[in-house]
A protein has these predicted regions:
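Alpha-helix initiation/capping motif
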Residues: 25, 71-75, 131, 156
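Electropositive phosphate-/nucleotide-binding environments in soluble metabolic enzymes
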Residues: 2, 31, 76-83, 132, ...
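Peripheral (often C-terminal) accessory segments that flank ATP-dependent C-N-forming ligase machineries
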Residues: 141-184
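Phosphate-binding core of ATP-grasp and ATP-grasp-like enzymes
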Residues: 12-20, 27-71, 80-101, 105-112, ...
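Short beta-strand-to-loop capping motifs
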Residues: 1, 36, 169-172
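ATP-dependent carboxylate-activation loops
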Residues: 119-141
Length: 184
């Protein structure tokens, strides 16, 4: 999609306290969110969700995610390539123990890091979606690891693979005049 770079530069610069601007290239392709626990340098990634961007055209040039779903539609080989990239990226950040949240795009069949952060995800991904999808209590394991307890890596292995989907709603402007059926 074409974007007026002069306009984008001025808008970004107007919000920059230093007047500096960073330009990134948009890589088209499916995106996934990952959630990992790193134990002694090894990343265990029970959280793996396809991200949903059905409103890219509506909100352009802004990129608004409107949910995700598990299990991923990606094949096992591609999922492993994503896990390997998360492992490599976490290692390059020096993370030997702790949590890693990753957002990855697959462009031309190759995974690329959009974001990698030493934190848990928000938006119910780590607290609700991963446990519902896999039976893995990643938040509990992360808390126990932070308290210095050892984690049995078997508890990070999925117990099942149940479908889970979440969508964010962006309703049109208006006024709610009534709510019917709330008593049922």
């Amino acid at each position: 999609q074409e974007v007026d770079l002069d306009w984008a530069y001025e808008v970004a610069r107007g919000h920059s306290p230093t007047g500096r601007v960073m330009l990134e290239r948009f890589l088209p392709g499916p995106q996934v969110s990952t959630e990992s626990l790193v134990i002694e340098g090894n990343a265990y990634t029970p959280g793996f969700a396809d991200r949903n961007y059905e409103y890219l055209e509506r909100y352009a040039p802004h990129i608004i995610e409107n949910g995700g779903q598990l299990p991923s539609h990606l094949n096992v080989t591609t999922q492993q390539a994503v896990r390997d990239l998360v492992q490599k990226a976490a290692s390059s950040m020096g993370i030997r123990n702790g949590v890693v949240k990753g957002d990855i795009v697959l462009a031309d069949g190759q995974p690329y890091v959009i974001e990698l952060a030493a934190r848990l995800s928000g938006g119910y991904f780590c607290t609700h979606e991963i446990p519902l999808n896999t039976g893995v209590d990643l938040v509990g394991a992360a808390i126990r690891q932070a308290l210095g307890e050892s984690i049995d890596t078997k508890e990070l292995l999925p117990k099942w693979n149940r479908p889970v989907a979440q969508r964010y709603l962006f309703p049109s402007l208006g006024v709610v005049r009534a709510v019917e059926g709330a008593d049922r």
